[in-house]
Amino acid sequence: MSLQELCRKNLPDCELPEFFDDYVLQLLGLHWQDHGSLQRTGKNQVLVQQEPIHINEALKSAASEGNYEIVELLLSWEADPRYAVVGALESNYYDLVHKYYDQVKDCHDMLPLIQNPEMFEKCHELNNTCSLKCLFKHAVIHDMLPILQKYSDYLDGWQYCNQILFELACKRQKYNMVVWIEGVLGVGNFKILFTIAINNRDLQLYSLGYLIILERLYSCGQDPTFLLNHFLRDVSMKGLLPFVLKTIEFGGSKEIAITLAKKYQHKHILKYFETEEC
């Protein structure tokens, strides 16, 4: 092991000697150009010119500068290689991207680290076997609405894909996506929202479904009673009191709920209504 390797391995966990100027640190590979001294202080943290920073953020920054030496050093200190690829991608250092992408293997593993829609799409393109439908699904999962908005003309009329995205948004509790997909793209089977909400015990989604569909029915002059009581029967038979109450709040029949509670012996529902009447 060389002196440089020995120092890089052992010095980072100790306080750097005061006589270590930039020249010495450069010789030891512990100087980050335009930043200063670099020192490891724990598994997930480094000091950059004595300022603490998460090792992965340091790696992302070094990669965005195309600084191979610092990237290699931080990776040897067990930084997450995903941040190297994301940082390099931000500044179009594709030679560095391809060098470390093999350590990541799946672009989808990096998507949660990205907040910028353009970068998100750029990262997804690293896997050239993925389709646009795959991009759209991950846009839903990671709340990247601007991507769906960008491709809204492309998605317009693609009912099969829009239905998949809508159901995915419901299952993943991406409520803003649910509203946008239904309102802008449209879906063939909106009622699946209620099935998903009931199966997942997602009262917020269940309520959102009524807000959307009742507005549509009222605007067309249609009576929502049949729809309300249809789902009221379902949640009443299952004994889901919060869903029963929410349906009644929107106009469902309390009598139906009580009748089914008696039939299926849901004592907690009966007790609620008995207490309410007292």
UniProtKB/Swiss-Prot annotation:
Family: Belongs to the asfivirus MGF 505 family.
Cited function: Plays a role in virus cell tropism, and may be required for efficient virus replication in macrophages.
Keyword DNA damage (UniProt): no
Pfam families named in the record: DUF249 (PF03158)
This protein's UniProt keywords: Early protein
Protein name (Swiss-Prot/TrEMBL): Protein MGF 505-3R
Induction remark: Expressed in the early phase of the viral replicative cycle.
